[in-house]
Amino acid sequence: MAQFWAEGSLEKNNALVEYLKQYGVVRTDKVAEVMETIDRALFVPEGFTPYTDSPMPIGYNATISAPHMHATCLELLKDYLQPGMHALDVGSGSGYLTACFAMMVGPEGRAVGIEHIPELVVASTENVERSAAAALMKDGSLSFHVSDGRLGWPDAAPYDAIHVGAAAPEIPRPLLEQLKPGGRMVIPVGTYSQDLQVIDKSADGSTSVRNDASVRYVPLTSRSAQLQDS
């Protein structure tokens, strides 16, 4: 997916959401509302233009995804982010999408972010504390954990929604096992050439897979491999 407009052309979060609506990436009021509520600028490091439709580096060879990719994933998962549901964000990075999930599932649900770089967990916690999702982290319905995302987070499983923010060569089995029957996972799969795959698990535990788009994500890998060139 290519970016939709030139760098530096937008200065407000609401303007970003409006552009995403105009280009058909944000298609529902539910996704528009949460993206308007969680200001992307709070999750992008200083010195970068937060409302540009481009991924941004957040340190440690990690990025915050482009806004159109956040919108795409939220639209794909919105029916699995109803109040009271459980959501897992693998490779939570800046914490932006985990905060969006938390706002959608609400205080009766659970939104869990998994990140294997401890410094990013600290940063994402600080980001959320400045955002509209701060109260949800305080009451425990939103949490971040230092762990290998490929292993998921069994403590809050099963999950209605699982999002993976880095590309895996194949779908990690622990994530499939932690996906609730009737739930959905969105994950980029591949090495250089990647597809954003949508995995739906039926009530009997069988799964169906479809490709939604060709994408380019950083790899889902070990902490040591990620930090090797940082």
UniProtKB/Swiss-Prot annotation:
This is Protein-L-isoaspartate O-methyltransferase. Its EC number is 2.1.1.77. One of its GO terms (cellular component) is cytoplasm. It catalyses: [protein]-L-isoaspartate + S-adenosyl-L-methionine = [protein]-L-isoaspartate alpha-methyl ester + S-adenosyl-L-homocysteine. Keywords: Cytoplasm, Methyltransferase, S-adenosyl-L-methionine, Transferase. Catalyzes the methyl esterification of L-isoaspartyl residues in peptides and proteins that result from spontaneous decomposition of normal L-aspartyl and L-asparaginyl residues. It plays a role in the repair and/or degradation of damaged proteins. This enzyme does not act on D-aspartyl residues. The gene is PCM. Monomer. Gene3D superfamilies: Vaccinia Virus protein VP39. GO terms for biological process: methylation; protein modification process. It is found in: Cytoplasm. The keyword Oxidoreductase does not apply. Belongs to the methyltransferase superfamily. L-isoaspartyl/D-aspartyl protein methyltransferase family. Highest contents in seeds.
